[in-house]
Amino acid sequence: MAALALSEAMVNDRRKAFEALKAELSAKASLPSLPIEGTIATAIPELDRLLAGGFPSGSVATLEGATGRWSIAAGLVSAMTRRSLVAILDDGALYPPGLADAGACLERVLIVPVRKALEVARAADIILRSRICRLILMPAIALRDSIWARLATLAHRNGVLLIVMATRAGAALSAVAELRLHCALERIIMRGTHGLWGGFAGFQLRVNLRKHKHILPGRQARVRALSSLSAMSS
């Protein structure tokens, strides 16, 4: 009987300790994030606040979702071309005028046409090793775990931000990605009168944080992507 009572007491003590630890972690999760060293700002205030400064340099990150991921990428490319070269491995999804509308300096954008998975992997490997660009964008493709791991190692070693554009990241990519963001269309923004006489002004995105090395997932930000015509008329 004494042994049974002692065992129950130990279980109760462990349960109390667990509840106390859970409460402490929950309290820490509600605190504002501190700025993280070695980040690359996106020039989108709402997104930079979500990421405590921006994308982590020297890492693999994903921009996911059916809508809006290229709007986020365009803002980042615009900010980066002010001080560095940017490489984009293009499988046909890129629309260069959209980059220009976002303010990117196209003379500092290296566009590499790619079609096959092997071409994408080789191009990413070569540019990462060359260290000529601080930012590389590439399409999501099916690669072996070892290849994703090698690309992640090269990005980390050379201080390059490698962003993978994906509708949804697969298991191998998710494993090596230090940051994962998912973009979703929240609403269309109209200019002027609604209906026949209204005009498209842009859209509002909801950006969800799915993975981050230093920040708990689940946080989100709302970002407005305005068309160039709307910006000119405002």
Model-flagged regions — what are they?
Residues 16, 42, 68-75, 94, ...:
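Charged, alpha-helix-enriched surfaces in structured cytosolic catalytic cores
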Residues 47, 63, 109, 136, ...:
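Conserved RecA-like P-loop NTPase ATPase core
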Residues 53-55, 79-80, 103-104, 126-130, ...:
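Conserved catalytic network of the ASCE P-loop NTPase/AAA+ motor domain
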Residues 132-172:
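A contiguous pocket-lining binding segment that forms or flanks enzyme active sites
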